[in-house]
């Protein structure tokens, strides 16, 4: 129970704009809901942590192009299993932990942010009109712009369920096998999921380099082990080749056939092609250029705040895949950052009382780590433990649903909001 004094001592309501309702954004929002009500944040792992001594009047606005939380990690299975797909997308209004009068969700996209005036311009997906939204604190967590099949094309849950259904139908009709192009994390997981869920379909993975995961700063031992598990799963591997052209061939009935031309002159035919090659780019076009690196990532301080050179920098935070920070982009890192941004912004709110000095928590440098779900097994790498794999590793890292329950329960999203 809260052990905080009345909110009446604060003369105004704090307006927080969260851009992006995925792992980092929702973690930040949930943390602020806890702290503003005088509770220990649900993500606080500090032993004997004490709740804030004061409650705060707060209004959180979350802007997202989607109408709900989508479990991005589960994409390789969601696009191969209709039943699983329906589980991975939950509309924001159906999440018990977010049914609070202190938070609202707006489906749309942010076009621009004026750090000086603290005003964001938002394109409302429903009205198709641009509106101005004033804020006191901004937490940018809109991630990377990814393309299908890394993420679904749909922006609404009902559309996504139909999209997944059609995609699974294409797999069932792929009598001439399936080709996955790209040996990054998504391509690797997708190929093994297809073999697990559709064992009667031949699956071929084509990658332009000599090893899978060639773009990641990971040891050769890890990459080679992933390649071995792909082969053990029955995936045919073609390394060192680029696909130059893909052509649809006319067939009778529902059977579809695709012709793929490789750089070495070979021709391959498949009933279904999944292109998992794409360069994800940060969704930061709405932010000032001074806050971004040349690649478009947000430059942040260890507190997750914008660089000091920007106006009102202390009131602007960025978290997750869109920021320039060490380590491989992962949902765990995004949630970790979201917690930091929320705690530090809450400290600044408390500091409006002249007697309170804010105490920030800071990010530490993160080494490259990775965990891949490959059918019934998983492969992990950390600098301390090296490469590990096995069904027991899969159970710990992903459970039975590609980490959905682990993430959902960690955020405690089934627990009803308590006033």
PLM region descriptions:
Residues 22-25, 184-188, 342:
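Catalytic nucleophile loop
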